[in-house]
UniProtKB/Swiss-Prot annotation:
GO terms for cellular component: cytosol. The lineage of its organism: Bacteria, Bacillati, Actinomycetota, Actinomycetes, Mycobacteriales. HAMAP family: DapA. NCBIfam families: dapA (TIGR00674). Belongs to the DapA family. This is 4-hydroxy-tetrahydrodipicolinate synthase. One of its GO terms (molecular function) is 4-hydroxy-tetrahydrodipicolinate synthase activity. Pyruvate binds at residues 57, 213. PANTHER family: 4-HYDROXY-2-OXOGLUTARATE ALDOLASE, MITOCHONDRIAL, DIHYDRODIPICOLINATE SYNTHASE. Catalyzes the condensation of (S)-aspartate-beta-semialdehyde [(S)-ASA] and pyruvate to 4-hydroxy-tetrahydrodipicolinate (HTPA). It comes from Corynebacterium glutamicum (strain ATCC 13032 / DSM 20300 / JCM 1318 / BCRC 11384 / CCUG 27702 / LMG 3730 / NBRC 12168 / NCIMB 10025 / NRRL B-2784 / 534). Its main location: cytoplasm. Homotetramer; dimer of dimers. It comes from the Bacteria. It catalyses: L-aspartate 4-semialdehyde + pyruvate = (2S,4S)-4-hydroxy-2,3,4,5-tetrahydrodipicolinate + H2O + H(+).
Length: 301
């Protein structure tokens, strides 16, 4: 049974309130490193202490390894040690993920986000071998990303217990939402547990979660930090108020998808990070107007 030491150590490496940061592009579709620096500095200035780069919202499927590393190095230079930088290195190819992990470690990542292999649907033993190979490749702490809605398979509870025994696996980003199973796993494994689904941010804190890896945090970084702080200080009334006020952003994310929501929200706030790469579409004018109204309701515009 864990004493909670792992969770404490995990938070030291992965922070408490973060976002899966967008990858900015120019009008021609090339990566925009200057805009990447700008948005990273903005988010950290507004209270976030961790940034996931090249995750789902960072359009990892449609960015190259070179682009991922260029952005990581630039953001590291921009924010210094003011925030933890977590590099998304998960793919459905173990060899590729190992190579990305090694490169991210050399580029200065504080942690690695490793998603469940998607499309190929490996067995649980395959997951153990996959995550184990990545964990053995570097000494950089790992946050597992459990998101069966995208990957097609979950990390089952027994698999999670076995993975928690590996010394560099310290955290989980949960976008599965099995609250009953996770309540036991948080206690048993001591892994730092992060909300990977904004509708459940406050719920995860109540169950012993360590923080958030958010999408709506692009639009509301200060409010998200205040939500976390209010809960930690025992002001549950205020935490509930903030959570409720942010609900229009959660609804907008459900309509638009995370990438489109995050990029459009930043643009409406005066930070241009370009459009998503295909096949993800930018919001049309009607969708953009609805988002503008949702942001006003949430008090972020």
């Amino acid at each position: 049974m864990s004493t909670g030491l792992t969770a404490k150590t995990g938070v030291e490496h992965f922070g408490t309130v973060g976002v899966a940061m967008v990858t900015p592009f120019t009008e021609s579709g090339d990566i925009d490193i200057a805009a990447g620096r700008e948005v990273a500095a903005y988010l950290v200035d507004k209270g976030l202490d961790s940034l996931v780069l090249a995750g789902t919202t960072g359009e990892s499927p449609t960015t190259t390894a070179a682009e991922k590393l260029e952005l990581l190095k630039a953001v590291r230079e921009e924010v210094g040690d003011r925030a933890k930088l977590i590099a998304g290195v998960g793919t459905n190819n173990t060899r590729t993920s190992v190579e990305l992990a090694e490169a991210a470690a050399s580029a200065g990542a504080d942690g690695l986000l490793v998603v469940t292999p998607y499309y190929s649907k490996p067995s649980q033993e395959g997951l153990l071998a996959h995550f184990g190979a990545i964990a053995a490749a570097t000494e950089v702490p790992i946050c597992l990303y459990d998101i069966p809605g995208r990957s097609g398979i979950p990390i089952e509870s027994d698999t999670m217990r076995r993975l928690s025994e590996l010394p560099t696996i310290l955290a989980v980003k949960d976008a599965k939402g099995d609250l009953v199973a996770a309540t036991s796993l948080i206690k048993e494994t001591g892994l730092a547990w992060y909300s990977g689904d904004d509708p459940l941010n406050l719920v995860w804190l109540a169950l012993g979660g360590s923080g958030f890896i958010s999408v709506i945090g692009h639009a509301a970084p200060t409010a998200l930090r205040e939500l976390y702080t209010s809960f930690e200080e025992g002001d549950l009334v205020r935490a509930r108020e903030i959570n409720a006020k942010l609900s229009p952003l959660v609804a907008a994310q459900g309509r638009l998808g995370g990438v489109s929501l995050a990029k459009a929200a930043l643009r409406l706030q005066g930070i241009n990070v370009g459009d998503p790469r295909l096949p993800i579409m930018a919001p049309n004018e009607q969708e953009l107007e609805a988002l503008r109204e949702d942001m006003k309701k949430a008090g972020v515009l």
